[in-house]
Structures are given as structure tokens and as C-alpha cells.
Amino acid sequence: MQPNITGVILAGGRSSRMGGNDKGLIPLNGKPLFQYVIDRFKPQVSDLLINANRNQGLYKESGIPVIDDIITGFVGPLAGMHAGLSYASTEWVVFAPCDVPALPSDLVSQLWQGKKQALAAYANDDERAHPTFALMHISLKTQLADYLIRGDRKLMLFLDSINAQRVKFSGKADLFSNLNTPADCDLWEQKRRGQ
């Protein structure tokens, strides 16, 4: 049986490919990108947090608590994961980036089932790994902090070092598509209007 799990939306990046605009706040069909993630993610978790390092007031308007990085300096998604592990009120935390509006509706249940005895698991589709879609036990918080303090930043290397389980999401590559550029957003909006 799946326990209570805290979900954390990772919105703490610099959004350099979006011209510095906060990616999670980019409007898509009149709604901020991160709100699509909330809509898909919230039903899967018992509690939800947003990790953001700027524009926190705008994220708070969603009614979801906002947490910032404890280890500062825009050190990547691992800093947001560390913050999530630190602030979570549950033993397990699942992460998703703010720029994937169609994330799988079975993300959490599949990661939970696929983790087996591991303390962490991450998504993998038919083509590649998606390490920002990860489930972690809060006991990894200290190990993750040590990794970041050493100056390491590579998410996959950290997941490999803790023997995270790779969980296959066959036939779902399109659900992991992230919107990195304004052109990606335009294309996504066009597809949605065409449905």
C-alpha cells in the first residue's frame, strides 16, 4: 500500500532558454505553466509544495506553500530536491519539474511500485531517463546536502550513487515533454487548441 507522499514542483531554475522569464509562470492558453503541473500532480499526492527561488508571491497565489532552496546559488534541481526533503512532512517525497504540463497521471503510483526496496526511483521512458521525476526517502537529505556541498551538481550521478531504481514508463515519452523555449510553448498551445 502506498503511504502518504509529499509532491514538490521544481520551479527554482534560471529559465535561461526562456530568455530569463520564470518558466513556471509562462502563460499557456491564459493559465501559468506550473498550474497545469499542479492539476496533474495534486491528485497523486497527499501534500504539495512548490520550490521557487524568485517570484514566490506569484506562486503562492495558487494556494500551494512555496519553499526556497536551503543550499543557495541556483545549484540546479538537486537544491530544490534537498529543500523538498527538508520541508516535507512525510517520509517519501516525489518531484516533478514545473515545465511538463502533461506529466503522467500514474507517475507517483508507478514510481512507488517500481522502487522496490530502494530509497529512490526515477522515471525513464522508451527513449531516455527523466531524473527530475523522482521519488526519494527523506533519509537521503544529508547525503544529498553533502553531495551539493562538495560542489557536485549532476542529478543522474547522484541517483546512481544512491542506487536509485529506474522505473520504465513505456509508450509515454510525450507525457514527459518539457517546454524549454517560447517555440515549445507555442507548439504546445497549438496542439491543445487542435484537440
Curated annotation (Swiss-Prot):
Reaction(s) catalysed (UniProt annotation): Mo-molybdopterin + GTP + H(+) = Mo-molybdopterin guanine dinucleotide + diphosphate
Cofactor(s) for this UniProt protein: Mg(2+)
Key words, A-Z: Cytoplasm, GTP-binding, Magnesium, Metal-binding, Molybdenum cofactor biosynthesis, Nucleotide-binding, Transferase
Entry-linked SUPFAM superfamilies: Nucleotide-diphospho-sugar transferases
UniProt GO BP: bis(molybdopterin guanine dinucleotide)molybdenum biosynthetic process
Entry GO MF terms: GTP binding; metal ion binding; molybdenum cofactor guanylyltransferase activity
EC numbers on record: 2.7.7.77
Cell compartments where the protein resides: Cytoplasm
Binding site for Mg(2+): D99
GO cellular component: cytoplasm
Residues noted as binding GTP in the record, renumbered to the chain: L10, A11, G12, K23, N51, D69, D99
Stored Pfam families: NTP_transf_3 (PF12804)
CDD domains found in the cross-reference section: MobA (cd02503)
Signal peptide (residue range): none
Xref: PANTHER family: MOLYBDENUM COFACTOR GUANYLYLTRANSFERASE
Free-text comment about domains: The N-terminal domain determines nucleotide recognition and specific binding, while the C-terminal domain determines the specific binding to the target protein.
Sequence similarity: Belongs to the MobA family.
General function of this protein: Transfers a GMP moiety from GTP to Mo-molybdopterin (Mo-MPT) cofactor (Moco or molybdenum cofactor) to form Mo-molybdopterin guanine dinucleotide (Mo-MGD) cofactor.
Subunit structure: Monomer.
Record's protein name: Molybdenum cofactor guanylyltransferase
Lineage: Bacteria, Pseudomonadati, Pseudomonadota, Gammaproteobacteria, Enterobacterales
Gene that produces this protein: mobA
